Amino acid sequence: TLMRKTVALLISFLCCFSLAAQDLYEQYIATYSDAAVAEMYRSGVPASITLAQGLLESGMGRSTLAVQANNHFGIKCHGWTGMKVYHDDDAKDECFRKYESVEDSYKDHSDFLRYKDRYKFLFDLEPTDYKGWCYGLKSAGYATDPSYANKLINIIEKYRLYEFDRPQ
């Protein structure tokens, strides 16, 4: 019947769409995992946290900020003296940091967490305590979304990003 064909087509479409989204996540991870691990060794920020935040904040590297400003973490200007871009976020025309490369964004994200007083307590956690880091980022005010920590945890667990936190 027409109804069965429509339902079958819809299910096929949803499966393909889901697989395509999963492929985008995996593509992002494959592209930036080395940078995240390098930052973990340099700064102490777990690679799982960097990757999960990068995935979430940049829409898998496809957000306007990621594409136009190489800003994969949604970091705003606040005292920034480098290049800037203006983008609507919580308010209209907010100032965001702009980077020469995605790797510069990753480095600045690590330094942002490492040297801002409100995040210092995170570095007392074990690097493998990704849940502690996620809840800590939320409690320190990294994002306004009440589900932020859980979203990060879901990404980390679904894509096994915690495996990047273990010394090789």
Positions of predicted regions on the chain:
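Bacterial Sec-dependent N-terminal signal peptides
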Residues: 1-24
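Catalytic cores of secreted/periplasmic lytic hydrolases that degrade extracellular macromolecules
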Residues: 19-168
